Amino acid sequence: MMNDLGLYVHIPFCQARCHYCDFVSLCPRPGDIDNYLGALEKELLGFDRLFDRSIIETIYIGGGTPSILNLDQTGRLLEMLQPLRKAVTEFTIEANPESVSDEKVRLWQDHGIDRVSLGMQTSDPLWLKTLGRIHTTEKVAQAVDIIRQRIDCLNIDLIYGLAPGDKTYMKTLEEIIGLRPQHISIYELEVYDHLPLAKMLSERVDSDESFEQFHRLMSRLESAGYQRYEVSNFSLPGFEAKHNQRYWKRQNTLGIGLGAHSLIDNKRFNNTADLTQYLAEERIEHRENLSS
């Protein structure tokens, strides 16, 4: 019997590390990306038997910043995934505005990518700088225009809860709604004491204000025709993210790459977050069986 499967592929590299980011990400040294793609291909080949008994329904390339890959590296990655695409109904890649180009998006389209998740986060220049984002609002508009010409579904991310009394998040939302993406994700800013942002903020948003901000955002999104279908996700009808829903439904999802997590047949496991170990094929860091 064939089982359905979602595939997550982690590209951990970023041009610059955001001041709030606690994901598995790093700035690449010369050779890191090419070496990583080689290790990724070896890991993929190790799951041949799982792929033979599975129908892969969704592929999600996340990060990090997958759009940081140059054209040759992007082509190499997508060629790896090409044999797994035959039954895929949703193929997503994450991107940041500063690394979107027409040539890259054309390559995505040629390899079946039909959904792009774009990290905007805020349209306020001061907050972009505080968060360590390296794009501008002009770059967002340019990226959206390029993506729209070739890709069916666009998601844009927004962060709220930046500071007590802050109102810029609603301005950002209005700008996003004006771009009319099919999907919008809104995330509360999480401040970790070990990251640079913690030292840059004089005050933090309390839970009551965060709740109020979320509900303002939700109300405006609903009035603009977006339907909430998960905690942080809103879409126009028919554009709900299939891959996201696999996690909520605890459906089989294989994660490959640095720090990637998997859930297969009620067994959870995750890869090491240490690049040196991963390149040496010392991948699996933790396993556990989940009760049904």
Regions found by a protein language model. Give the residues of each.
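Local cysteine-cluster metal-coordination motifs and their immediate loop/turn environment
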Residues: 12-25
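C-terminal scaffold of the Radical SAM
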Residues: 2-4, 25-49, 55-292
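Short active-site neighborhood of thiol/selenol oxidoreductases, capturing the structured segment around
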Residues: 7-10
